[in-house]
């Protein structure tokens, strides 16, 4: 058999391909640890209902800026490697707010000139009295865009991290058979768009719950999309929080709605591992994830 002649150009190409195949992939670079931070958001960021005294904010337990060693917040994790952030952890979230309130929070935070801004927002935009009262995708996106334009325009701000809205449908799924949860939801009219008539199997109620979950997903898509418009500074959690399963212990039994201290700890851990300060964040997921398999 005659020898096969390989040109110099072909040999060079084969060598380059071989190097690509055998050379280890570069590890994604984590963003530098910030010297200051703040959090915007709603009652989750305020760690509502996690203190010994009920029905108050408990910012020491916040997943983002809290000081509790039990929760091990983003602030504490950063502090462990960068003591310059000590005492520079502002919680500017407010219980009960919606996305329409985020631009105002970001204006306030911008004046602080912090380097890292975390935000969780959107739970109250889906957890309304009726499905008709849920915030539209258009309004939600516009308000988020305004907020991000404000905060990313501050040259001191290096990173803005947005977490996905938790999968609220899980509340119904894990507590629908719990009589205490059902009575609490009814007495305090908790998230009635989703949690009204929790034991009903009537098609109208089944459809209503699915409508809320679908809107939950739509608003998370909006967060992902708008964040990408500010990609130089904005980081989305890749659906990590949405795709995380709740255990009953992760939800406070005071209202069967807000994260317990254990829930804040889980929120902190999941969001940190998916976030901007780790070299290899957890894999990006998506709305088709099954939270039961992504704990």
Question: Where in this protein do the model-derived segments appear?
Answer:
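Short glycine-rich His-centered loop
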Residues: 31-69
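Catalytic His-Asp segment of secreted/periplasmic serine-dependent ester chemistry enzymes
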Residues: 171-295
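Structural recognition of the beta-strand scaffold that forms the well-ordered cores
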Residues: 36-48, 87-93, 115-120, 125-127, ...
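Bacterial Sec-dependent signal peptides at the C-terminal "C-region" and cleavage site
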Residues: 23-32
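Conserved SGNH/GDSL esterase-like catalytic core that processes O-acyl groups on lipids
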Residues: 53-149
